[in-house]
UniProtKB/Swiss-Prot annotation:
This is Phenylalanine--tRNA ligase alpha subunit. The keyword DNA repair does not apply. InterPro entries: aa-tRNA-synth_II, aa-tRNA-synth_II/BPL/LPL, Phe-tRNA-synth_IIc_asu, Phe-tRNA_ligase_II_N, Phe_tRNA_ligase_alpha1_bac, Phenylalanyl-tRNA_Synthase, tRNA-bd_arm. It is found in: Cytoplasm. The lineage of its organism: Bacteria, Pseudomonadati, Pseudomonadota, Betaproteobacteria, Burkholderiales. HAMAP family: Phe_tRNA_synth_alpha1. CDD domains: PheRS_alpha_core. Keywords: Aminoacyl-tRNA synthetase, ATP-binding, Cytoplasm, Ligase, Magnesium, Metal-binding, Nucleotide-binding, Protein biosynthesis. The gene is pheS. NCBIfam families: pheS. Binds 2 magnesium ions per tetramer. It catalyses: tRNA(Phe) + L-phenylalanine + ATP = L-phenylalanyl-tRNA(Phe) + AMP + diphosphate + H(+).
Length: 354
């Protein structure tokens, strides 16, 4: 190495030390990313200080070029490390400022989770079960797809009865294992037949206690308007024994209405009517202000043919049955005038009963 090259190398080393010091100071003084990027270009850009020094290596002899090149790369790494550290510091400062601005006061009360509630019809369903359960009635369940025999024939409906037509009943393709027609049940009365038959089998050869059961559930008919739906909920009741009378029917149902509507002054009348499965039969009406009466149930003494289909001797056993729409009871209890509101799922409507 010549004396001139030695002097040049010493000067370059001094320049490198100064570049490191200047870069560290410049980066530390940068208060935002834009300023930091400008300072980066001053030292590491295409025309930056370190880049210019690298260009000058070509004037040195091979041995000196190798030594100084390594030194310049070392300095470059120091400058890049200072740049990275400052970038991280700025990012941390920005995050801390954002967190401070968006800080959550953990002492504030939380937002309550919205709670659901029972559908008004289900409230009625449970209330009916509770009232009848308190006077010794069981609750029975059964299939919604029934046979033509169980839904109609067992209940003394003649073959030419209008209810059997496709205009009133949803029939299902296919038949059961006994080749009987299948349909969506039009009432929950088939559950009464099933329950009674099981009751008779259970107490075969023994003293049989009275049959007291209610049968709530979904039913289906070809009908749809403001007061009718193709699917609706119904509850039917049955009480059969050796000395059950029509007076018992009047007493049980009147007591039920008073408890359901929580009124002791309810006026009820039993109006003669016709149903294939009861004889005598009656519509049950309830008084609603201004001398108006509203039908709320059908009822009557169980027909002897139905008792036979249940496996009971009509000469020994007698009983009564009734059936009420749960939607109708719900509408009367809450003053609702359109049945379709129950099926629309409007949360604004349902919240009124939460």
């Amino acid at each position: 190495m010549s004396r001139r090259q030695a002097i040049s190398t010493t000067a370059m080393s001094q320049d490198l030390d100064q570049i490191v010091a200047d870069a560290q100071a410049a980066f530390a003084a940068a208060n935002d990313n834009a300023t930091l990027e400008n300072e980066k270009a001053r030292f590491l850009g295409k025309t930056g200080a370190l880049t210019e020094l690298l260009k000058g290596l070509g004037k040195l002899d091979p041995e000196t070029r190798k030594t100084e090149g390594a030194r310049i790369n070392q300095v470059k790494q120091q400058v890049e490390a200072a740049l990275t550290a400052r970038r991280q510091a700025l990012a941390d400062a920005l995050m801390n400022a954002r967190l401070s601005a968006e800080a959550i006061d953990v002492t504030l009360p939380g937002r309550a989770v919205s709670r659901g509630s029972l559908h008004p019809v289900m409230r009625t369903w449970e209330r009916v079960e509770q009232i009848f359960g308190s006077i010794g009635f069981d609750v029975a369940d059964g299939p919604e797809i029934e046979t033509d025999w169980m839904n109609f024939t067992a209940l003394n409906n003649p073959d030419n009865h209008p209810a059997r037509s496709m205009q009133d009943t949803f029939y299902i393709d296919g038949r059961d294992s006994d080749d009987k027609l299948l349909l969506l049940r039009t009432h929950t009365s088939p559950m009464q037949v099933r329950y009674a038959k099981m009751h008779v089998e259970k107490y075969a050869g023994k003293a049989m206690p009275p049959i007291k059961v209610i049968c709530p559930g979904r039913t289906y008919r070809v009908d749809s308007d403001a007061t009718h739906s193709p699917m609706f909920n119904q509850v039917e009741g049955l009480w059969i024994g050796e000395d059950v009378s029509f007076a018992d029917l009047k007493g049980v149902y009147t007591d039920f209405l008073r408890k359901f509507f929580e009124r002791d002054d309810i006026q009820v009348r039993f109006r003669p009517s016709y149903f294939p499965f009861t004889e005598p039969s009656a519509e049950i009406d309830m008084a609603f202000g201004n001398g108006k009466w509203l039908e709320i149930s059908g009822s009557g003494q169980v027909h002897p043919n139905v008792l036979r289909n249940m496996g009971l001797d009509p000469e020994r056993y007698i009983g009564f049955a009734f059936g009420s729409g749960l939607e109708r009871l719900t509408m009367l209890r809450y003053g609702i005038n359109d049945l379709r509101l129950f099926f629309e799922g409007d949360v604004r409507f349902l919240r009124q009963f939460a």
